[in-house]
């Protein structure tokens, strides 16, 4: 019973926030135009600031390179295995890259990081934020590769220069690396010189950053709910089922199963919470505009976000319940 309550308490707030966003849309409080503008605010301002604030507080000694290595190896294996599978499943050329992206690219920044906090408090949130410095850039690089190299119906080729520029200009990556730069300066320059300075010393500035950071998660979840569009797309049924089940069932079963069987004593509870956040969450919302920009099947991309989010409400609960029963938390 304790494991059931633990899992429900971790997952329910996130699911309910998304439901509230959908309800606001239905009663006219959040229309499509508002949702688009709010989404831009979240990903261009609030989320980068949140990542900056969380990473800024960490110490270099907090970084577990072994754990990060496991996550990156798992990500690249998933990416590699998904390509031949999607080539077999996808009915059209412009669906292959969309499916591949859906399988490896979880909603880590939007749903995963707050989920890690729900699962294991500030320690879980910190572990997830530290991993984001490595995982989010890799998500973006692999997404661009999958959508360009695996083909699209537009026939356009994306130049390597554009790929690099898009990655560098990504607001989340800017927030992450700005924080890492500050941590490095503080640890390697200021502290050895006997200077103890943090942004919290400048109270007005730090409070403004905290205000913006605190807006990121609740607004992002409300917007996610407001952007839900349910539609039956018979022609995409095979791809939707395959992409949704692979993203929400097969990937977490493999990554978390291996971690539990072979690294249970090695990984902490906060790190298991981070694994759930990184590999059990639904398809990333930003995958849709990226597909649209690069000539993929936008309808499929949108439906994969919707259906994987719905299914993950159940699968994340079950994963959390099983890990709690097994003593990972």
Residue ranges and their predicted role:
Residues 1-329:
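Alpha-helical transmembrane segments of multi-pass small-molecule/ion transporters
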């Amino acid at each position: 019973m304790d494991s059931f309550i633990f899992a429900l308490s971790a997952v329910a707030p996130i699911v309910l926030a998304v439901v509230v966003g959908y309800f606001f849309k239905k009663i006219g409080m959040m229309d499509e135009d508002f949702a688009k503008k709010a989404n831009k605010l979240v990903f261009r301002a609030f989320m980068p600031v949140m990542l900056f604030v969380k990473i800024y507080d960490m110490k270099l000694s907090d970084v577990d390179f072994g754990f990060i290595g496991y996550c990156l190896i798992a990500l690249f294996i998933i990416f590699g295995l998904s390509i031949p599978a999607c080539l077999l499943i996808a009915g059209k050329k412009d669906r292959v890259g969309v499916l591949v992206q859906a399988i490896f690219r979880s909603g880590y920044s939007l749903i995963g990081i707050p989920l890690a906090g729900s699962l294991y408090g500030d320690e879980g949130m910190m572990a997830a934020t530290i991993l984001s410095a490595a995982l989010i850039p890799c998500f973006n690089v692999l997404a661009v590769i999958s959508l360009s190299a695996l083909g699209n119906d537009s026939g356009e080729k994306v130049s390597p220069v554009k790929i690099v520029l898009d990655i560098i200009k990504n607001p989340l990556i800017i927030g992450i690396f700005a924080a890492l730069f500050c941590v490095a300066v503080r640890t390697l320059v200021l502290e050895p010189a006997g200077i103890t300075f943090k942004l919290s010393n400048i109270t007005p500035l730090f409070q403004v950053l905290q205000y913006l950071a605190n807006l990121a998660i609740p607004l992002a979840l409300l917007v996610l709910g407001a952007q839900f569009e349910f539609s039956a797309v018979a022609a995409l049924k095979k791809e939707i089922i395959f992409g949704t089940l692979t993203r929400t069932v097969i990937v977490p079963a493999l990554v978390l199963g291996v971690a539990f069987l072979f690294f249970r004593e090695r990984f902490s509870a906060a790190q298991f919470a981070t694994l759930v956040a990184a590999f059990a969450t639904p398809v990333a919302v930003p995958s849709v505009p990226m597909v649209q920009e690069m000539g993929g099947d936008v309808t499929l991309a949108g439906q994969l976000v919707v259906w994987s989010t719905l299914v993950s409400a159940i699968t994340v609960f079950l994963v959390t319940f099983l890990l709690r029963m097994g003593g990972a938390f």
